[in-house]
């Protein structure tokens, strides 16, 4: 298998075969993200993708999961995606699911029948970076979508039978917009009612616009305790979920939590209250945090 540049995947895809079908991110303007700063977006030639699948077939027999990289593989047209999915199922008879990152524009750009076709071909989960439910925060970070568009895109995918894992980012509004960010994020996720919700904590990446804003004083990073308080506020505003698997086990977070909402909401809030009462001693040390 051949890879170009930095390749990332969600923690839940740790055991998946990672197949690059695009390079970089077609948007690549989010001010906090440094993943693809050195990798201009381009579509990988289809013949190369199919060759990689043939190579993987020889060494990854028994593969059950595949993740399509890079930043938003669903930018590809439906015909090309179905050809890739067909080739994967031919190469890996035991394949159970294929996953990919997707943004609102990608999902809304495909019809219901197109998404249903992709689901039938094996695309069973997409990972969507909501980041924030606040339109002001989304505008400042140059996300390229409004909260309403993000909500619509997740509902659109789920209506086609594709599971969605939503990702939001603690601290993204700084102290100024912390309350708005937390409350609006909780409301947006509630409106989405996704199968999975993961919260990460902002870590500034050198070379990104947000890092430069922090250096020049125009953006302020939340203190760890304030990050935790923001997390609690998001959980408080999560209402009407129907079996959402909730995780804060990413290495960027100060406190790892896991549960299913709404069943475990009271337990999660109690754990957060305990951590807030204990202060720094309850938090993951900075040296242990990472992206």
Each model region followed by its residue ranges:
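Aromatic/hydrophobic pocket-lining residues that form the small-molecule binding cavity
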Residues: 49, 81, 111, 150, ...
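Auxiliary Fe-S-binding modules of radical SAM enzymes
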Residues: 1-13, 92, 187-291
